[in-house]
Amino acid sequence: MMKKFKLIALLLCVAAITAKAQKQCWTINPETNAIEMILSDETIPYSDHIEMSGEMVSFVTRWNIDEQKNFTQERSLVFPMLRTIPNNTHASLMYRMQTDIVSLLGVNGLAPVQLGTKKVSINGALRVVSQYGIGVVNTGAARKRAPSPVVEITYTGFPSTTLPMMCETYEVKNITGRTITVIVPEFVQKAKTDPEKGVDGSYIIQAEIYGNGTFKIEPGKSIEFGAAFQAYREKNEKALTPDVKAEYAKRMAYVKNSIDGSLVLETPEKVIDTEFRFAKIRASESIYRTKGGLMHGPGGESYYAAIWANDQSEYVNPLFPFMGYQIGNESSLNCYKHFARFMND
């Protein structure tokens, strides 16, 4: 009995020490219900990841903020309807891209240098506000001059609701007292997969910038452009040209109508309410339009476009009718129909 008591006491001490050592890295915006990162010396460096999905795509963004508060990311793209060999339940095309879109820009003829992250928030999309600077012509003593702040760039990453692509928007704001020139270049990056490893032969994974051009931006003003990361079959398909701004509007409409429009949890604890809201987003977005109909998949770079037994039938399917979520209801009914084909009489 005494040994048991000592063990319990030890576990309680460890739990107390662990709780004390944990840092609060996020706060809840009471007006938008977004979660916002606390950027301080106590919370950085920081690394994290988040998965978001649409009917034809899923992606995991692995992102990091280093000691200088600079943001970097790696995109792990998943295309559940582009099947690989062996064509089993895990046979989704997957590809990682670390393309740094901002590094491709020209600001007054110079490459922008990141000077730190000002804000990180999540609310149906990952939004990062960072400051960038430029130096001067690299001659003589100018080599030693630190870059001067020139632009503030707001990055927003999110999935298309219906297309096989991850979308990104970039807002470039002039934070100087003079007019600057920003060049958004034409840019296409393609990768072709091994035809022997694809059910439909080779697949093309493509990154592209939309809204390129040369822009003069007055003080306090901004411009916007977009980028998308997509995949398609080489044999009989072509790259899509999305309206990235419209895709963002569709994503936010889904959050507003399907998530915030029904089954809203209200308790004395805002953290619990927010956890439930984000759980609704993840549960309801992760539904894929397969050849066999709409199917829910837990994700995690492993579980897509298939029947995952109790994950669907027991855990998530009963939620959708309470949400009034039609796509979820359709995927639930489809799941049970597939189950019925294998049930005993």
Predicted stretch roles:
Residues 21-274, 324-328:
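Terminal accessory carbohydrate-recognition/targeting modules of carbohydrate-active enzymes
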Residues 7-10, 172, 315:
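Short amphipathic alpha-helical "recognition" segments used for binding
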Residues 3, 17, 248, 277-279:
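Short alpha-helical segments used as structural interaction elements across diverse proteins
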Residues 256-345:
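Substrate-binding groove/exosite segments of carbohydrate-active enzymes
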Residues 1-23:
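Bacterial Sec-dependent N-terminal signal peptides
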Residues 9-12, 16, 81, 89, ...:
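A periodicity- and composition-biased signal for non-globular, repetitive helical segments
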Residues 14, 148, 162-163, 295, ...:
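Generic secretory/membrane-interface signal
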